[in-house]
Amino acid sequence: MFALAQHTARRTLSRQQWTKVVVSAANYSSGSLSSTIRISSIPAPHTGEITVLSLNRPRARNAISTALLGELNTVVEQLHAQGDKSSTRALILTSESDDAFCAGADLKERLTFTEEDTRNFLKTLRHTFTRLSTLPIPTISAISSIAFGGGLELALCTNFRVLASTASIGLPETRLAIIPGGGGTYRLPALIGETRARDLILTGRRVSGEEAYFIGLADRLVQISEQELGEKGVARGRVLEEATAMAKGICEGGPVAIRAAQAAVSGWRDGEGSENKAYERVIPTKDRLEALTAFGEKRKPSFQGR
């Protein structure tokens, strides 16, 4: 689907296989070794695929550099350009590193920026994050470790967040004498409410996976046992497994219906108009008739996305 070569994983993977897959990136991920994002895919139910984007700057804790941002922007724009013709039915953001989902901005690179460089970087960052947040397909972040600053803002751009109990997230920008600049000051309040968002942003404190789930910042919480804590790749594999299960569960629905529902919910502020417009997309589909036929025949429907 993308310019980078892709590797398709098997439809069903055990927990042990997932752990092995995550630890051995070469067996699962694709793309050049110098790539800051690795792209892979998993077959989705019925048709199409679930695309997995793995941030791949382990030495920098996946900090958002100009190069990483450029690659992310390219992938997001390709998905938008493909529209309904895209074979990607859901998107998962994860990490190639046990140590970090994303530590935020690349501060070492930022030290070399002029004020104009900083403004230009933020302009690209905001554009890319907004485009990610408006993709017509379900998007999920899988986080097992740290997601700070721009890393958390990146996760806020996805529809869902799966966190491990080992995760630690926050918006510490005020402690660096700045404020969140990638959407944190408006996406976080929209998600968890103004008061809780103000608490996290003004204090800059870190939040555990459990607290994130409690306040509604995480949609799924994966508990990691004490025994599993010391096992390489396990927490990362577990959240990816849960995120994939969530994506597959979503993709059990009709492809056109999932996109229509995504659009309707995104337009909830428009009320009935958004829903009615989205419903018109599914009425003429063959998948709708297939679902009715399958119900009458007491079998599972087979959707083709048309």
Swiss-Prot record:
Keywords annotated in UniProt: Isomerase, Lyase, Virulence
Gene Ontology BP annotations: fatty acid beta-oxidation
EC id: 4.2.1.17
Reaction catalysis annotation: a (3S)-3-hydroxyacyl-CoA = a (2E)-enoyl-CoA + H2O; a 4-saturated-(3S)-3-hydroxyacyl-CoA = a (3E)-enoyl-CoA + H2O
Keyword Transmembrane found: no
One example GO MF annotation: enoyl-CoA hydratase activity
Keyword Isomerase attributed: yes
Annotated GO CC locations: mitochondrion
Site (Important for catalytic activity): E173
Pathway entry: Siderophore biosynthesis
Database matches in Gene3D superfamilies: 2-enoyl-CoA Hydratase, Chain A, domain 1 (3.90.226.10), Lyase 2-enoyl-coa Hydratase, Chain A, domain 2 (1.10.12.10)
InterPro entries: ClpP/crotonase-like_dom_sf, Enoyl-CoA_hydra/iso, Enoyl-CoA_hydra_C
Domain of life, per lineage: Eukaryota
Similarity comment text for this entry: Belongs to the enoyl-CoA hydratase/isomerase family.
Function field: Enoyl-CoA isomerase/hydratase involved in the biosynthesis of a ferrichrome A-like siderophore which may contribute to organismal virulence. The first step of siderophore biosynthesis is performed by the HMG-CoA synthase (HMGS) MYCGRDRAFT_54740 which catalyzes the generation of HMG-CoA and CoA using acetoacetyl-CoA and acetyl-CoA as substrates. The enoyl-CoA isomerase/hydratase MYCGRDRAFT_76805 then catalyzes the conversion of HMG-CoA to methylglutaconyl-CoA. The acyltransferase MYCGRDRAFT_85486 then fuses methylglutaconyl-CoA with hydroxyornithine to yield methylglutaconyl hydroxyornithine.
Designated name of the protein: Enoyl-CoA isomerase/hydratase MYCGRDRAFT_76805
